[in-house]
Amino acid sequence: MKGYCDMRGFLTFLVLRLISKKNISGEEISKEIEKRKGSKPSPGTIYPVLKYLKENGLIHEIQDTGKLKRYTITKKGERELKIATKKFISIFCDMKEEFN
């Protein structure tokens, strides 16, 4: 993975950022996004992102009680998140400049 360029947009960035804060389930990720955005993403939106992050070694799946799966960020995920954060900040600052 080559930093931000391979991250599939803002949703992937946001999911990875949420996972970096705490071990979290897919349902909890959806609820956190709903709090921020006002609408809850469907499982068909969240779980492909989790699969992508897992297949690229950015997160690990942890079996919690029962069938609940939680996700935790890997060292590689932390590095990629740092790169992506800088890139998104740069993009959004540039956009803000254009609109002012």
Stretch-by-stretch model annotation:
Residues 61:
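Short beta-strand "wing" residues that participate in macromolecule-binding interfaces
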Residues 65-85:
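Basic, amphipathic "hinge/linker" alpha-helix immediately C-terminal to the N-terminal HTH DNA-binding motif
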Residues 1-5, 97-100:
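Short, Lys/Arg-enriched, disordered terminal segments
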